[in-house]
């Protein structure tokens, strides 16, 4: 992976650039609490991924550098605001279209890590659930129902000793539904620590008191895909380490 000379991205102050390749592929390490894209009004906001205007019709951010030159960042997928980790975009619409096709065809290999409750009855392996979206008091909620099939391969990596009974798990989803991993964990009674919608609220408060950790402990840690552009095969891989506060739980 090579970084190339590029205009400075007007990134959220807690996010950072991981890669900007000659092919136009851009990878950003998004901080927890940052929106992948703005709310419908499209206005600049300190909680947005980029401090720039967002053009909804073209799914891109646009800004002008000090020399008066206009630049764009085309968003290729999204992460929930509470989730941290790798988010992919492109500096040009052609590359963005190719990447979006890979996401749509489920040809992107994604790996997440999460800290969850420990439940001896929960099983690792291949998780399959049918989930539906609902509106409850105007807020989006996802639950088991007669909806799209959601799949993920899951491994339990490490258990923390102590009364909180926490564990680190790896999740590799082959589908990308809204709130999918959070709900799949909740359905197996191992909710993700810090989840303020589907979580164990008592445990969340306890972890916050003990570790000062007040966020969803879900991190997009690895992404891999290939695209063919102008006859050339381009393979892209990117990693993002666990945020320090999450990693400290197991040290």
Regions found by a protein language model. Give the residues of each.
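Beta-strand secondary-structure signal
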Residues: 88, 113, 128, 153, ...
């Amino acid at each position: 992976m090579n970084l190339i000379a590029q205009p400075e991205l007007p990134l959220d102050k807690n996010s950072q650039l991981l890669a900007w390749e000659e092919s136009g592929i851009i990878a950003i390490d998004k901080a927890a609490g940052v929106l992948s894209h703005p709310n419908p009004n499209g206005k600049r906001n300190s909680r947005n991924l980029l401090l720039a205007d967002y053009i909804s019709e073209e799914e891109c951010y646009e800004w002008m550098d000090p020399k008066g030159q206009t630049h764009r960042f085309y968003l290729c997928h999204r992460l929930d605001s509470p989730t941290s980790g790798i988010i992919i975009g492109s500096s040009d619409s052609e590359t963005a279209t190719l990447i979006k096709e890979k996401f749509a065809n489920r040809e992107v290999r994604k790996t997440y890590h999460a800290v969850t409750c420990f439940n001896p009855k929960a099983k690792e392996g291949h998780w399959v659930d049918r989930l539906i979206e609902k509106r409850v008091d105007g807020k989006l909620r996802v639950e088991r129902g007669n909806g799209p099939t959601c799949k993920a391969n899951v491994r339990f990596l490490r258990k923390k000793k102590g009364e909180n009974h926490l564990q680190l798990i790896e999740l590799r989803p082959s589908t990308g539904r809204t709130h999918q991993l959070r709900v799949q964990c909740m359905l197996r009674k191992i909710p993700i620590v810090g989840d303020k919608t589907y979580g164990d609220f008592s445990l969340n408060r306890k972890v916050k008191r003990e570790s000062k950790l007040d966020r969803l402990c879900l991190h997009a840690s690895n992404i891999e895909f290939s695209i063919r552009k102008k006859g050339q095969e381009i393979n892209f891989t990117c990693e993002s380490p666990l945020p320090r506060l999450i990693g400290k739980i197991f040290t």
